Amino acid sequence: FTKKLAGRKLKAGEFSFVLKNAAGEEVETVKNKEDGTVTFSELSFDNTKVGTHTYTVEEVIPATKELGMTYDTMKATLTVEVSKNGHTLTTVTNVSSADGVNENGESTDGTEDKEFNNKITPPETPVFQPEKFVLNKEKYDITGTKLVDDDNELTNEYTETNANPYADKTNNNEAENINTKTVERGDKLVYQVWLDTKNFSDKNNIQSVGISDTYDAEKVTVNAADIKAYDSVTGQDVTAKFDIKVENGVITATSKASMNKSLGDVDNTQVIDTTKFEFGRYYKFDIPATVKDTVKAGADIENKANQIVHVYNPVSKSVETPEKPTQKRVNSVPVTVDLKFTKKLEGRTLAAGEFSFVLKKDNVAVETVKNDKDGKITFKKFKFGKDDLGKTYTYTVSEVAGTDTTVTYDDMVATVTVKVAHDGTAKAIVATVTDAPDKEFNNTVTPPEEPKFQPEKYVVSKEKYDITGDKLLDDDKELADKYADTNVNPYADNTVNNDVENLNTKTVERGDKLVYQVWLD
């Protein structure tokens, strides 16, 4: 007889075959050779065995069948007719089979079929597609599918976002979906990864399922204890069904060995027990991550994940690990631009808050600030993120002219342009600043002309003397400098040319009334 095995190479001694007599008693059991031949020992007949002898040959189907193996149930009946002609014994052997198939699976009933055909079939390849999202909250829509259509604008969201994570447009995203959006240092992100078992069944011989998530360990902090898994059908927390680890920037979550059962084969192959770990659903993982304070301005924070399925293949007797990626997701920290100018004042010391300066963006005022005591002019930092990509902004800074007539104000208008782009090599948003050539506002203080005045002083004998006149002015004209001379010696004034009412230097009596007339000039 012969043995054929479809699906993989036949091994010597892999299958057993039994020869039985008409009474159903075992005569001999043998195994196949590597080339598929099945050979029993010769049967001998003597003069006492003249007549018809019937035997059957069947494959011995083991109590514990090999996974995926379809055994040939054919029973071949051998009829040996022994006859004697003179002193010579002759035999004629006929074979007829029942319940057998040929290598194409077609029935061979009633034919002289001497070939046992077995077939081993690998398990169906599991069909799955994991998903990945970046959210601003935990436990979002665990039992729903609101996020599924957030990438509908893409032809192939998996290949396109892995090539360029910014390919995802936000206009059709859920509000909780913050993929591609700008985040601040210290913000909490929630990476939600969906492990897909929707199309799995027992026939897949799945030994374990899990996800592998690669995160930017230099830019975000992830703690294994914070990671949770939820059943998308029941909404229950099923974290206890997974072994979760965080090592070297990679998060792994794999179904526990305690979720398995034996297939009952000779190798005691372990597969997932669907009474403990149900298929036909997503297992959604919430992975909280906090943006580190040390992230460089403009830096991309990328995240990607894969789903791995361990499948036992009885054909190769090996474990296969089909794997599929999720979408790649990205966030970025804003890039900042400082607009700083200086103020100088000639003519006197500059005071804090003395002058005002207005900043305009595209000719619209956005902020007005004052100088400090050192002349520094500092506007608030400008932040640029994903929404600014491809844009160029023009800023102008000018001094707000004051009303102090002693100050000459600088009428300079300083122009700064900022061009925002994404550097794919550096994986960062960059702002290219074209600064103003002159960033110093210069004012000059011109003091007023010193007022010219000369007060006068007289001693007269009457009040309201010559109030509207100037008769007294020439009373000291005999002096070269009446102010200096009289301050040194008030008797320097000679009375010969004084008005009669002018009593300066004259003798007066006790009780006399003098009138000091002072002229404010």
For each feature predicted by the language model, list its residue ranges:
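Solvent-exposed loop/turn and edge beta-strand elements of beta-rich ligand-binding domains
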Residues: F1-D521
